[in-house]
Curated annotation (Swiss-Prot):
Key words of the record: Cell inner membrane, Cell membrane, Membrane, Transmembrane, Transmembrane helix, Transport
Annotated protein name in UniProt: Multidrug resistance protein MdtL
Main location: membrane
Residues on Cytoplasmic side: 1-3, 63-68, 114-130, 179-216, 268-270, 316-332, 379-395
Membrane topology (Periplasmic): 25-41, 90-92, 152-157, 238-246, 292-294, 354-357
Any GO CC annotation of this UniProt entry: plasma membrane
SUPFAM superfamilies found in the cross-reference section: MFS general substrate transporter (SSF103473)
Length: 395
């Protein structure tokens, strides 16, 4: 079991590393590529577009050909794309490398969740996904620090050499440590009801959890996207103050994420999901009424706590009904989360909504819709019956 957890954690970490590792070198990259920093900021959107593109195909391929091949190919693509970025001499080549990086990271991301669905029951999976969320919160804090230390002695290309090395490590883990988990056959009692056709993505329970997780990701990405404006322009923080504040909010996320597995031993998953949405609603109201920086910071802290306590539980429930189509289910969740959050941020920008109102709107909207869905669409017997761990996996 440890090998599956190690490989899943490694596969997921490529995604945030690809976002945060290079940011510290952005000014130097802009100078060397004769591009403005604002032009290169599109690299974030290009990276997410690559992830969404990979998710369109990676899940189905993983269900048909296995988790291991997709993980290996994804790691290789990420490694090669990182090298391409390091060799870029102009902006378009750099953005092409970022798109390919997203493809590699997206394939690995999908496979990681499919592996956890293959190997863990719902109770253990919810705990592991909460821990995984806590670990991924470490990357946005550590990656800029590591990047800064690297750039003290080496050029910005070394940042992508480091990411390339991460791709190599993940590829080696996938090749030599990871075992195939794609179901070959299920226990005899499951054969009559567990088939790809029976595991439809169009069912009320999955759609409800897809909506909840998509709205939750929209909240956290809106917070990340709006944070520079809120903290530095509206609240008057310096870059140093901004970095410290974001590190502290990431620390809150880590503490809550690592505490959630213990909370699951005391409370029902539904209770934690309601607490999560209650924190979002409280954060939205707090931010709308805030007149001081202290109150605003308290509201931002509630956002991080709310996301950390509920996201892993909701993701675990969403994957629960799928024994044979875990890859496709994971892809669908990833695509909805990336595209849904991007759509909200884009629409808010087009409509000229301020950063604060953009955040307040998604907080209140997410909490109200999610609470209604939690009460109206609860796990039923058919979902519980589908919660099966593959009886036999490939060696």
């Amino acid at each position: 079991m440890k090998r599956f957890l190690l490989c899943s954690f490694a596969l997921v970490l490529l995604y945030p590393a690809g976002i945060d590792m290079y940011l510290v070198g952005l000014p130097r990259i802009a100078v060397d590529l004769n591009a403005s920093e604002s032009q290169l900021h599109i690299a974030f959107s290009v990276y997410l577009a690559g992830m969404a593109t990979a998710m369109l195909f990676a899940g189905k391929i993983a269900d048909q050909s296995g988790r291991k091949p997709v993980a290996i190919v994804g790691a290789i693509v990420f490694m090669m794309a990182s090298l391409l970025c390091s060799r870029a001499s102009e902006g378009s080549l750099f953005l092409s490398g970022r798109f390919l990086q997203g493809i590699g990271a997206g394939g690995c991301y999908v496979v990681a969740f499919a592996i956890l669905r293959d190997t863990l029951d719902e109770h253990r999976r919810a705990k592991v996904l909460s821990l995984l969320n806590g670990i991924t919160c470490i990357v946005p804090v550590l990656a800029p620090v590591v990047g800064h230390l690297i750039m003290l002695r080496f050029p910005w290309q070394s940042l992508f050499y480091t990411m390339s090395a991460m791709g190599i490590i993940v590829g080696l883990l996938s090749l030599f440590i990871l075992r195939e988990t794609r179901p070959v056959r299920l226990a005899p009692r499951d054969l009559s009801r567990s088939s790809p056709a029976a595991e439809s993505l169009i069912n009320r329970f999955f759609v409800s959890r897809l909506a909840i997780t998509t709205l939750s990701v929209s909240v956290i990405l809106t917070f990340v996207n709006a944070s520079p404006v809120l903290l530095m322009e509206v609240m008057g923080f310096s870059r140093g103050d901004y970095a410290i504040t974001m590190a502290l909010t990431a620390g809150v996320s880590m503490v809550v994420s690592f505490s959630t597995p213990f909370a699951l031993g005391l409370f029902k998953p539904r209770t934690l999901m309601l607490v999560s949405q209650g924190l979002f609603l409280t954060a939205g109201v707090t931010l709308s009424l805030a007149h001081t920086n202290t109150v605003t910071l308290f509201g931002l802290t509630l956002i991080c706590a709310g996301f950390s306590v509920g996201f892993g539980v909701a993701m675990s429930q969403a994957l629960g009904p799928f024994s044979l189509r875990a890859g496709v289910a994971s892809s669908t969740l990833g695509i909805a989360q990336v595209c849904g959050s991007s759509l909200w941020i884009w629409l808010a920008a087009i409509l000229g909504i301020s950063a604060m109102n953009m955040l307040i709107g998604i907080l209140i909207g997410c909490s109200i819709v999610s609470i209604l869905l939690i009460f109206s669409v609860a796990p039923n017997r058919s979902v519980a019956e589908h919660e099966e761990i593959p009886y036999q996996s490939r060696p």
